Every structure is written in structure tokens, then in C-alpha cells.
């Protein structure tokens, strides 16, 4: 394990270490990937927390019930593993697999202008989160937006009509009064 800061890379957050598991230095991971165990496909992780950066190597990992458990190379002590809680798990953007046409990573949607069918700017995509039914976009007001409201829009085919990354915008079927 290296605790020296990584060279400035274009890193994408794939999950977070939330606590320890067992007595051998394993950690519990909350994964943002779909399926959740895809985070285990990356052997080298960059961990970030409050300006602290660590490069680690994944020795092994498994899905245990609904919990993702990871063993990091050289991390064999439960108490030391406990200090890893709260670290974000990051990988270089260049290591992400290519997606099919019409598929997007969440990071690509963040910052897009959201425009309704009437041509009104509702705001920009701040972030997304998962629900049981579908992903949800948090759209925050920005300069030139219709009003100062924050909106929660479903990331579904019914709501999202088109995405133009080059133009930096997303067209939606959404009532501005909602």
C-alpha cells in the first residue's frame, strides 16, 4: 500500500469503504456500480478522504449476502482496517469500460442543462441517486433557470427524451410545476 498522493488523475468514484468486516482486516464496501460487485473488477484502487490519498491493491473480494467484502493487500489488522472507513474508492476514468450507444455514466450527466419540452431551462443535473424503482436526478437551479427550485426527476425513458453531451444538455418530458 502506498500512502503517497497519486499523480493528478481523472478519477471516478465507484464506491466507499463503510466499515470493517471480521478480524483479518477485511472491509465492507458500499458500491455505486451496477451490479454492485463490478467494483471488484478493478485490482488497483485510489482511496480518497478529506484530501488524503492512498493507492491500494485489491487482494480479493466477494459478495456475502447483501454485503460486499474486500481484502486489501497488506491490510491484515482489524483496527488498522477500521481507519479506512469513509474513504471513497476511485479508479481512473480511462479504466471504465466503453458503454453501448445511448448508455451513460452518471458522471457524464452531472452538469448537463435540463430543458423541458417548452424549451424552459429547469436547472442542471447536480447528482443522481438510486431508488428501488429507478435512478433519480437532482436538478438544481442555475443562472437562467426558470426558478430557484430543486427538482427530483426520474432517470427513465419516459422522462429523459434526449441527451446531447456535446451541447451539454438533456431534454426532458417534465412539467415545470412539478
UniProtKB/Swiss-Prot annotation:
It is found in: Cytoplasm. Its main location: cytoplasm. Residues 101-178 form the PRC barrel domain. One of its GO terms (biological process) is rRNA processing. It comes from the Bacteria. The keyword Ribosomal protein does not apply. One of its GO terms (molecular function) is ribosome binding. InterPro entries: PRC_barrel-like_sf, PRC_RimM, RimM, RimM_N, RimM_N_sf, Transl_B-barrel_sf. GO terms for cellular component: cytoplasm; ribosome. Keywords: Chaperone, Cytoplasm, Ribosome biogenesis, rRNA processing. The keyword rRNA processing applies. Pfam families: PRC_RimM, RimM. Disulfide bonds: none annotated. NCBIfam families: 16S_RimM. Binds ribosomal protein uS19. Belongs to the RimM family. The PRC barrel domain binds ribosomal protein uS19. An accessory protein needed during the final step in the assembly of 30S ribosomal subunit, possibly for assembly of the head region. Essential for efficient processing of 16S rRNA. May be needed both before and after RbfA during the maturation of 16S rRNA. It has affinity for free ribosomal 30S subunits but not for 70S ribosomes. This is Ribosome maturation factor RimM. It comes from Ectopseudomonas mendocina (strain ymp). The lineage of its organism: Bacteria, Pseudomonadati, Pseudomonadota, Gammaproteobacteria, Pseudomonadales.
Amino acid at each position: 500500500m502506498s500512502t503517497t498522493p497519486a499523480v493528478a488523475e481523472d478519477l471516478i468514484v465507484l464506491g466507499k469503504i463503510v466499515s470493517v468486516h471480521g478480524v483479518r482486516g477485511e472491509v465492507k464496501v458500499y458500491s455505486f456500480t451496477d451490479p454492485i460487485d463490478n467494483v471488484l473488477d478493478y485490482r488497483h484502487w485510489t482511496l480518497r478522504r478529506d484530501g488524503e490519498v492512498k493507492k491500494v491493491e485489491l487482494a480479493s473480494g466477494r459478495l456475502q449476502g447483501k454485503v460486499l467484502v474486500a481484502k486489501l493487500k497488506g491490510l491484515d489488522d482489524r483496527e488498522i482496517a477500521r481507519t479506512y472507513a469513509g474513504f471513497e474508492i476511485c479508479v481512473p476514468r480511462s479504466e471504465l469500460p466503453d458503454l453501448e450507444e445511448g448508455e451513460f455514466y452518471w458522471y457524464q450527466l452531472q452538469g448537463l442543462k435540463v430543458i423541458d419540452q417548452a424549451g424552459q431551462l429547469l436547472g442542471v443535473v447536480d447528482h443522481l441517486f438510486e431508488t428501488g424503482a429507478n435512478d433519480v436526478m437532482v436538478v438544481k437551479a442555475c443562472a437562467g433557470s426558470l426558478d430557484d427550485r430543486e427538482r427530483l426527476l426520474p432517470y427513465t425513458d419516459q422522462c429523459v427524451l434526449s441527451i446531447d453531451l456535446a451541447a451539454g444538455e438533456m431534454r426532458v418530458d417534465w412539467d415545470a410545476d412539478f
